[in-house]
Amino acid sequence: MILEEVYEIIKQRIKEKPEGSYVAKLTTDDKKTAINKICEKIGEESTELILAAKDDKKDEIIYEAADLIFHTMVLLAYKNIEFEELLKEFERRKK
């Protein structure tokens, strides 16, 4: 599944902090600053998704939804939450 692959790349970049990596840039500072940066991006992407939806722009909705999901995955990985834990929560809600 592509989301799991992306999640593993995010985890790797948080750990290894390769030069030029956007994820590394978001997560390199002290924990409080890193969390603030990540949460600001989630807020920004949420707003952009809402605006795209209100404007009924399908392409923008898809683009902004992908951005929101990506930054949420960065937050989860930064907080050491495994992707499988998220999937288990969806499974629990399915019942």
UniProtKB/Swiss-Prot annotation:
NCBIfam families: histidine_hisI, PRK00400.1-3
EC number: 3.6.1.31
Subcellular location: Cytoplasm
Gene: hisE
Family assignment from sequence similarity: Belongs to the PRA-PH family.
HAMAP family documented for this protein: HisE (MF_01020)
Record keywords, A-Z: Amino-acid biosynthesis, ATP-binding, Cytoplasm, Histidine biosynthesis, Hydrolase, Nucleotide-binding
Metabolic or biological pathway, per its Swiss-Prot or TrEMBL entry: Amino-acid biosynthesis; L-histidine biosynthesis; L-histidine from 5-phospho-alpha-D-ribose 1-diphosphate: step 2/9
Highest taxon of the lineage: Archaea
Any one GO molecular function term: ATP binding
Protein name in UniProt: Phosphoribosyl-ATP pyrophosphatase
GO biological process, one term: L-histidine biosynthetic process
Listed GO CC annotations: cytoplasm
Reactions that this protein is recorded to catalyse: 1-(5-phospho-beta-D-ribosyl)-ATP + H2O = 1-(5-phospho-beta-D-ribosyl)-5'-AMP + diphosphate + H(+)
